Amino acid sequence: MTSDFKVIIVGGSVAGLSLAHCLEKIGVSFVVLEKGNQIAPQLGASIGILPNGGRILDQLGIFHSIEDEIEPLESAMMRYPDGFSFKSQYPQALHTSFGYPVAFLERQRFLQILYDKLKSKDCVFTNKRVVSIASGQDKVTAKTSDGAKYLADIVIGADGVHSIVRSEIWRHLKENSQISVLEAPNASIKHDYSCIYGISLNVPQIILGIQLNCLDDGVSIHLFTGKQSKLFWFVIIKTPQASFAKVEIDNTHTARCICEGLRTKKVSDTLCFEDVWSRCTIFKMTPLEEGVFKHWNYGRLACIGDAIRKMAPNNGQGANMAIEDACSLANILQKKISHGSIRDQDINSMFQEFSMAQRARTESVCAQSEFLVRMHANQGIGRRLLGRYLIPFLYDAPAGLSGFSISGATRIEFIDLPTRSLRGAWGKSWRGSWEFILQSLVYLRPKFRIVYALYLVAAAAFILYCLSSLFP
């Protein structure tokens, strides 16, 4: 390592390992403290890598290993309660526009790749639960449950929604009267849905490269094909507030009861959820938190990933935004180091710069996620009408929504862009839906063009009205 600056990363999952890779590239010393006994445990979860995450991983020299593990998505089928369905080419549209496929693979395998590609494996420690963090005048110390102490210049919390680093940030803010003692850390977090996720094998009637979605009342089912006859799936279900404690305490029994009740749900014309559930090899249930935490840093402490935001998996951006966080923080750190050693007074400004760089984008992507999970579950008359009667006739509206969130993505500024990303629509306005509308008008018979155009204008106006809050 070429820098005297040292970073403690609390948490060895997507955000933590991504940051470790970025720090390795700029020569900054680090340690990763993971509380679990494995870096890549098998929890039955899958992970979606969209072009914004894929581009960063490609810059880090990792994406080719991920591509070897995936069955790229090409299209998606959306099915509604009345049996109506439509096909979206959003995965292929995103691949064509940004240069990277929509990739789904086992979360365990993804984490293993991140770890295997890391050169400084001796800096990654498991069974290291951080129990306290003490800030000194010029250093910070993290103490783990086994009594070990680690000294560094800053501590980055990549330790998820129940982050001890974020708890320490809130404690300091309250002690220094920067926030009210009555202000709750989770005040901005919603708990409206739960997620059951799992992996099934050898499910019949599955076509590789096609994502299947059942968008029912209060529940949505999503299926993604993988290699080796694996099918990754998750069920998002509206959950009463009083039931969340039960979900956390006895999630296996609760999940089993819910899935048993969904057996007859048709995911396609030829496939019922029974076909998926009966071939399930592993599953788990978890409450879904949604929202952006208000405070991200204090002193020498800062958070990234799920420690600063939580979103439903419907837009597939959770892991990708965590990767972007790591990239954004590394960009700022690299600039500081390139101008000489980092002074104590530079640390707070560095974290403030990170917050300014990521907060607006974070809030926008989270708003999109909140909108999607509710539209997929047909919650509210406006979302129900939008999903069932308008979006299907705009052809690639799903691609447009995804394209909006991808086009403004962060990239590693100190590493050249890969060739495949140079042809992409990065940083440009996403006009896929509107281009299709203009093209479709050309091929319609003249007497239908006016009717179709008026319908699309009305549909577009309604969509813009519904989505206006999502794209500030």
From Swiss-Prot:
It comes from the Eukaryota. InterPro entries: FAD-bd, FAD/NAD-bd_sf, FAD_mOase_fung. One of its GO terms (molecular function) is FAD binding. Pfam families: FAD_binding_3. Induction: Expression is down-regulated when the stress-activated mitogen-activated protein kinase (sakA) is deleted. Pathway: Secondary metabolite biosynthesis. Keywords: FAD, Flavoprotein, Glycoprotein, Membrane, Monooxygenase, Oxidoreductase, Transmembrane, Transmembrane helix. The keyword Cell wall biogenesis/degradation does not apply. FAD binds at E34, G48, R107, D306, A319. It is found in: Membrane. GO terms for cellular component: membrane. Gene3D superfamilies: FAD/NAD(P)-binding domain. The chain crosses the membrane at residues 7-27, 450-470. Its cofactor is FAD. Belongs to the paxM FAD-dependent monooxygenase family. PANTHER family: FAD-BINDING DOMAIN-CONTAINING PROTEIN-RELATED, FAD-DEPENDENT MONOOXYGENASE ASQG-RELATED. FAD-dependent monooxygenase; part of the gene cluster that mediates the biosynthesis of lolitrems, indole-diterpene mycotoxins that are potent tremorgens in mammals, and are synthesized by clavicipitaceous fungal endophytes in association with their grass hosts. The geranylgeranyl diphosphate (GGPP) synthase ltmG is proposed to catalyze the first step in lolitrem biosynthesis. LtmG catalyzes a series of iterative condensations of isopentenyl diphosphate (IPP) with dimethylallyl diphosphate (DMAPP), geranyl diphosphate (GPP), and farnesyl diphosphate (FPP), to form GGPP. This is FAD-dependent monooxygenase ltmM. The lineage of its organism: Eukaryota, Fungi, Dikarya, Ascomycota, Pezizomycotina. The gene is ltmM.
